[in-house]
Amino acid sequence: MLKKHRSGDKKCSPSTRLLVMGLTFASMTIFPTLSQAQKLMTITGSSMLYPLETKWARSYEKKHPGTKIDVSATGSGMGYRQAFLGDVSIGASDAYETKNIKKQYPDMVNIPVAMEDVEIIYNLPGISRKIPLRLDGNTLALIFLGKIGYWDDRRLLAENPGISLPHQKIRVIHRKDPSGTTFVLTDFLSRTSHEWRDEIGRDMSPSWPIGKSFNGSAGISGGVSAIPWSIGYDGHYWVKRSGLPSAALKNHDGYFVTGSLDSITNAGKSAIKARPDSQNLDKSIVFWVPGKNVYPASNFEYWVVNPHLDSESMMDVRHLISWVLGSGQNPSLLESAGFAPVPMNSTRPLIREWLRNLLLGNSFKVVTPG
């Protein structure tokens, strides 16, 4: 233990003073003051939304040097769970709040932040990619139910007269972890196939009757790439990244449409136009909307917020959401990550009302992207 100097002691030598100054500087560096510490925000959940969230986080941090945002892809199920438990600032989900989800995670607020889709990917060696595989919802459901087992099944041949499909067993690939991507697919299948609806239904983690499972969006595209004669599903970004072909799905008006930023955007606009007074921007209003170039398995991507966060954390969340629904909707951020914007002109009043409720009555202004 150091002793105090008495009044008669000699003054410290220059070398001692330098040592003390060095230790003081080091302690300031190692143990920063509160003013030096960064605000930390955490986002976890949807692996589909992860690439866009990462871009948003880095862009937001540049504009707000005192903020650090950690983003992780744990699956939509974990996004809901950790937001509900208050373990993260924001949960991310491809799945809207069904009655079951609301019962399991009460009081959560879903805010649409972007649009994406779920595409059907496949690996058919030696088959030309110039013409995409065509599938209607019922045929696709029968494949995932194991009731269509070979690529040259008469129902597949009837939908694809321009493709020479071989007599090869179909290898089904699906998600292992609770997934919003799976929720979107099973919701689509439930709306297009009575058999799927009655036997499996809509779920983040259904009881798959057949197939091989993989974790995460990257796991699905990786599995399909590695397994010949396989079929699976993934989001637009991951499909483009994998280089795999995606099928054209039959939409409400009978057109076979592939997933693209245009067809996703058209689905959102058509949905809002068809149901302008809807109080829930969920996928039920995006499926089966009319239009020619409208992709039928488009979906809103959500941030899930716990309204019981402490006031300081909620203020940080408010600022981030304000930015995401404003400058964050800029095409330079969205399109590079494979996403389309929320149709803001139509949904602005509804989103503003949601955020007023979420932010304890504070007013909220959705700014113009730029």
Model feature map: region roles:
Residues V20-I30:
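Bacterial N-terminal signal peptides
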Residues D9-K10, M28, E61:
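Generic N-terminal simple sequence motifs
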